[in-house]
Amino acid sequence: MPGMEYSTVSKIYGPLMIVEGVKGVAYGEVVEIETESGEKRKGQVLEARENLAIVQVFEGTRDLDVKTTSVRFTGETLKVPVSMDMLGRIFNGIGKPIDGGPEIIPEDRRDVHGAPLNPVARAYPRDFIQTGISAIDGMNTLVRGQKLPIFSGSGLPHNMLAAQIARQAKVLGEEEQFAVVFAAMGITYEEANFFKKSFEETGAIERAVLFLNLADDPAIERIITPRMALTVAEYLAFDYDMQVLVILTDMTNYAEALREISAAREEVPGRRGYPGYMYTDLATIYERGGRVRGKKGSITQMPILTMPDDDITHPIPDLTGYITEGQIVLSRELHRKGIYPPIDVLPSLSRLMKDGIGKGRTREDHPQLAQQLYAAYAEGRSLRDLVAVVGEEALSETDRKYLKFADRFEREFIAQRYDEDRSIFETLDLGWELLAELPESELKRVRKEYILKYHPKYRKRGE
């Protein structure tokens, strides 16, 4: 029953504890746990039976004793205190300030699992979000309300890319408030300091809310951290009409925490030991994005995950790909070449790109230019493999130009400085500069009128 306190903890294992002899306990109910020394921790009911409750402890079960630990069931679900004062602040994985500032005075308290959204109430994602990164803006455009994950690998610079996107992202042509909600799960102290420094030194912290769960924090916190972040994002987007970009890193650490809890509960494992309900669980995070009819605000998600062994068929990226609307893939080969950001545009995809670009959104030539750049780069990459077999001497003059185009595309279009913020017009013009490397007869995917208007050869004549 709500408010009842029990000292009937029968077992503690991993992040879980079993409380026996309970009555009227509900799934998802918040509990307060008190140790013999008076220390208080929070937990949540994972499973409720007739007279037994399985509780997950957010701060971990270290130093808890079955004989001296008491548990009080509050009768409430986990709620997040929300306020506009959270902008510019840094919190730990369960929402406590860690920046030395005061506690937040909440304007409201929201359920951490969010309010259910009628699918009919959803508005289709549209409108271009400029990240300042050519490989994304030009080739795999991010659209307001989209879910576009970044598939990375261990040792690749996804943290730098996340910080750069958080710093540079903006909605063009509108006087709208833009905010970033950044949630990091299972990161090291070094990574946490990098993110803090990056946000604070560039002033991006003023429009951001940071949730940082460190590697030595209890793994169970990682289950709550992204939901905390999304609850705050929903508040900013749908109560204050803000355009919110949510960056979640690293979703692989989240899935590992999910597997740890599943193993502790002795559930039947699914693929590679992950719980069979991981798809559903990930969907409860990724589907908390988008736009709502009648509301000006939006939530755009960019989850980041490191693929174990660079395996894109691993259950985490595999299931993520089913739920989200594309992927940005980082390449170890490009990283070895010293190219930052090492975005491989060929396996990357933004399924909603067509709805956020073109006349009135970016520029009229954008869709066809992106197709032409993609086709030319794919041809150049294919010819590299051929050269490895037959040598460059066997290639035609046009083939050699494709090879040169592929090299320049990587060095000039994909590659850019960490502090370089390219506008979409700079990106598109750069694309045309590179296409000038090829014979005009090879530009078969672009209308003649766009060639006459934007191709450097004709543009310079017009000037």
Curated annotation (Swiss-Prot):
Q: Which Pfam families match?
A: ATP-synt_ab, ATP-synt_ab_N, ATP-synt_VA_C
Q: Per the annotation, which location comes first and is thus the protein's main one?
A: membrane
What's this protein's name? Answer: A-type ATP synthase subunit B
Subunit architecture: Has multiple subunits with at least A(3), B(3), C, D, E, F, H, I and proteolipid K(x).
Membrane topology note: Peripheral membrane protein
Q: Supply the PANTHER family for this chain.
A: V-TYPE PROTON ATPASE SUBUNIT B (PTHR43389:SF4)
Q: Subcellular location, in the record's words?
A: Cell membrane
Q: Which domain of life is it from?
A: Archaea
Which source organism does the UniProt entry give?
A: Desulfurococcus sp. (strain SY)
One GO location term (cellular component): proton-transporting two-sector ATPase complex, catalytic domain
Q: Which SUPFAM superfamilies match?
A: C-terminal domain of alpha and beta subunits of F1 ATP synthase, P-loop containing nucleoside triphosphate hydrolases
Q: Tell me yes or no: is Ribonucleoprotein among this UniProt entry's keywords.
A: no
Please give the PROSITE patterns that the UniProt record associates with this protein. ATPASE_ALPHA_BETA
Q: Which UniProt keywords apply?
A: ATP synthesis, Cell membrane, Hydrogen ion transport, Ion transport, Membrane, Transport
Function per UniProt: Component of the A-type ATP synthase that produces ATP from ADP in the presence of a proton gradient across the membrane. The B chain is a regulatory subunit.
A GO MF annotation of the entry reads:
ATP binding
Which Gene Ontology BP terms does the record give? proton motive force-driven plasma membrane ATP synthesis
| Family according to the record | Belongs to the ATPase alpha/beta chains family.
